[in-house]
A protein has these predicted regions:
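Glycine-/charge-enriched secondary-structure boundary and capping motifs
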Residues: 1-6, 10, 16-29, 167-169, ...
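Glycine-rich phosphate/pyrophosphate-binding loop regions near the starts of catalytic domains
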Residues: 30-239, 245-248, 254, 269-273, ...
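Catalytic nucleotidyltransferase
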Residues: 233, 593-599
Length: 717
């Protein structure tokens, strides 16, 4: 095998030759090919990721670990991360999605945390195509099948349809776990003289080369890539979770690492490199599922449900007994040593002898050229076509609320168990998912957001708005944000225009995080999401996590009461470009989204959190996809009561009711609280726009929409 077949570039191979002082053998070459792949090394994105603010007063563990951990109060921490499993889900939808869920759960487990909830970002192509139907059904079944069996509730997510995801659907899996602050596990604490223990499933040939496969664009014939997709077993994962947590509770493990991409090689070399130790692994000791596996296959297999433990000699017998108790394979496969050597042996022969730091962190960065797209000015030129749209808003509202990306997703959520562990306060379908932390009485609020249409028109403003829009649901619920994690889904960085979009989106995310003091504690980058030149739109996905103190109650949507006054807070000059209305009705994207307004966001945050803490409103919802009209529609449906809206139009009514962007929310306030509510929002744009009551939603200059008709449209009945 030559270096190019291993996936290495010529300058990378030259570095390897220089550092080793010799040519690598086949096993070593394969190791470098996988460990220096885009998927494992982040060589194209590392320079940009340095822009993210990573420090925060409540950050306990940040970027560089298996997941970030933030302080949840009273001696408890929340470990969380989002990660992609895009290529595998496109090739083998069920297993690709299932193992994506399993992998992110183990990342949380590796921090010493018990996984308590997951969310999933799903991006599909044309909903009417047979291909999308096959892929979406398989992916959703995979998410539900694994999460339900392993006992981790799926409490929310994001689903969006766009024809550009037809060949490259995206699955971004998020998981959050709970850990005692003094029991957080680090991947950087291994010491020489400890045993290396493999716990979990046997090792087979599934998933070999998966990391390298995820680092190139998909071919049109996906069948050939199926062997590179891993096979999951959630029942083994459940046992693995309990075994690992018991080992940690008893102080038997010093370091722990999930075996994901690149398998044993990745987990072992990363621990060695981060901890400053060497490692000798005996591949003959690895429990195998298949016969005649050669050294590099064992070293790079991505078989699921496996963890690598670093164990002090005095704790080894107890760890082996624990494996037996939980009916898991548990084997000593090596030891940690002084120095920087990473050595693989099999049958008495040394198959790899490499510097651990070179494998786990020595891949050089790539500085791709970035060019502003030549057609961007044309894309951003936009005049809203007021002709052709009636001022009657009932028809566009009924059509838009029934559109694929905005309609009810019961066909998805009914396949998920959202209540297992019985801590769910607000589950799928709401702007924010909320969990109860029984250990300290606090509530954790989680939101997931992605805005590919806005990012397509202005990636910087799109990145900024994505971050801000992920935070607003937390604030409206009453939560104070603790941190964020992101998954950066983009096409090939080798295209200068695409890399420019990637760079600008990251800058937008980073600036928003900095402006609003939201640290980035973990994340993932997924590049090369394209097939035969057909690329996905720029899709940075963000998950933000916040906390509601035990003394406060969350402010939830769907609780309108008869006689409540409806208030719109926030800017009226929102944006049609990149909106659901533009995508669904105008069938194309054009124009330039709103510029960021950091002070408006900060003012909104302060007042929204205060409104919830004072219990001034019966119901509240941030204005997200579809704008004011969709917020009114969803609140009417969820509350089972109508409203009469009175609002003057400085522009065409469509531009008022369906525009998106900016710090805006809809509040339902009982009459007794109106004076205090208006005082709380003094100095911020606020308008009373209507009154709750009746059995229809009555918009200005429009036919009343009976609630049953509105609900039927949303549910697709």
């Amino acid at each position: 095998m030559d270096f190019q077949k291993a996936g290495l570039r010529s300058h990378e191979y030259e570095i390897i030759l220089r550092e080793l002082g010799r040519e690598p053998n086949e096993t070593e070459l394969r190791i470098f090919g996988v460990m220096w792949s885009e998927h494992c090394s982040y060589k194209s994105s590392r320079p940009l990721l340095k822009l993210f603010p990573k420090e925060g007063e409540r950050v306990l563990k940040g970027v560089g670990e298996n997941a970030g951990v933030v302080d949840a109060g009273n001696g408890w921490g929340l470990a969380f991360k989002v990660e992609s499993h895009n290529h595998p889900s496109a090739v083998e939808p069920y297993q690709g999605a299932a193992t994506g869920v399993g992998g992110i759960i183990r990342d949380i487990l590796a921090m010493g945390a018990r996984p308590i909830a997951s969310l999933d970002g799903l991006f599909f192509g044309n909903p009417d195509s047979a291909k999308t139907c096959r892929l979406s059904n398989g992916i959703v079944k995979g998410v539900g099948g694994y999460g339900n069996c392993v006992g981790v509730p799926t409490i929310g997510g994001k689903t969006l349809y766009d024809e550009r995801y037809e060949d490259n659907p995206l699955l971004n899996a998020f998981c959050i776990g709970l850990v005692a602050s003094g029991s957080i596990v680090s991947s950087q604490t291994a010491e020489p003289g400890n045993w290396v223990v493999l716990l979990g499933s046997k090792t087979g040939r599934d998933g070999i080369g998966g990391a390298a496969f995820a680092s190139v664009e998909l071919g049109e014939d996906t069948k050939a890539s199926r062997p590179q997709v891993q096979i999951g077993d959630p029942f083994v994962e459940k046992l693995l979770i309990e075994a690992c947590l018991e080992a940690l509770e008893n102080g038997l493990v010093t370091t722990m690492q999930d075996m994901g991409a690149a398998g044993i090689t990745s987990s072992a070399s990363e621990i060695a490199a981060k901890s400053g130790v060497g490692m000798i692994l005996d591949l003959d000791r690895v429990p195998l599922r298949e016969e005649d596996m050669v050294a590099w296959e064992i070293a790079l297999s991505e078989s699921q449900e496996r963890m690598l433990l670093i164990v002090r000699p005095e704790n080894l017998e107890a760890v082996l007994a624990l494996g037996k108790k939980w009916d898991l394979d548990c084997a000593v496969i090596g030891e940690t040593i002084e120095g920087n050597r990473f050595i693989l042996r099999k049958g008495g022969e040394v198959f790899a002898d490499l510097p651990a730091s070179l494998i786990g962190g020595g891949c050089p960065e790539i500085s791709w050229p970035a060019e502003r797209p030549r057609d961007l000015d044309q894309r951003q030129s936009f005049d809203f076509p007021t002709t052709g749209f009636s001022e009657d808003l009932s028809r566009p509202l009924l059509s838009l609320i029934a559109s694929p990306s905005l309609k009810e997703k019961a066909w998805i959520t009914r396949q998920y168990d959202s209540m297992v562990q019985v801590n769910t306060v607000q589950g799928p379908g709401a702007p924010v998912s909320i969990l109860r932390i029984k250990e300290n009485g606090n509530l954790v609020a989680i939101s997931m957001e992605a805005l590919p249409w806005i990012c397509s028109l202005d990636p910087y403003r799109g990145g900024y708005e994505t971050m801000a829009r992920s935070l607003r649901p937390l604030w409206v619920s009453g939560a104070k944000h603790l941190g964020m994690t992101n998954c950066l889904n983009f096409p090939s960085p080798e295209n200068p225009e695409q890399f420019w979009e990637f760079s600008e989106a990251v800058k937008g995310l980073a600036d928003c995080c900095r402006d609003l003091s939201c640290p980035v504690v973990s994340g993932n980058v997924s590049l090369y999401n394209e097939t035969a030149g057909r690329s996905i739109p720029p899709t940075p996905l963000v998950c933000s996590v916040g906390i509601i103190e035990a003394s406060c109650s969350p402010l939830l949507p769907g609780n309108w009461k008869k006689g409540d006054f409806l208030f719109l807070v926030g800017m009226e000059n929102a944006s049609i470009p990149g909106s659901h209305f533009q995508k669904f009705f105008l069938k194309h994207l054009s124009g330039r989204p709103l510029p960021p307004s950091p002070q408006m966001e900060a003012d909104f945050m302060e007042r929204a959190v205060m409104t919830a803490a004072k219990k001034l409103a019966d119901s509240a919802i941030p204005l997200l996809g579809g704008g004011l009209a969709i917020a009114l529609g969803k609140e009417s449906i969820a509350s089972g009561i109508g409203a009469r809206i009175s609002l003057e139009f400085p522009t065409h009514p469509v531009a008022v009711f369906f525009a998106e962007g900016g710090a805006r929310a809809l509040y339902a306030v009982p009459a007794r609280n109106v004076p205090e509510f208006t005082r709380t929002w003094k100095g911020f744009p606020i308008r009373q726009i209507g009154l709750v009551g009746g059995d229809a939603l009555c918009l200005p200059q429009s036919d009343p929409i009976p609630l049953q008709i509105l609900a039927n449209a949303w549910k697709g009945a």
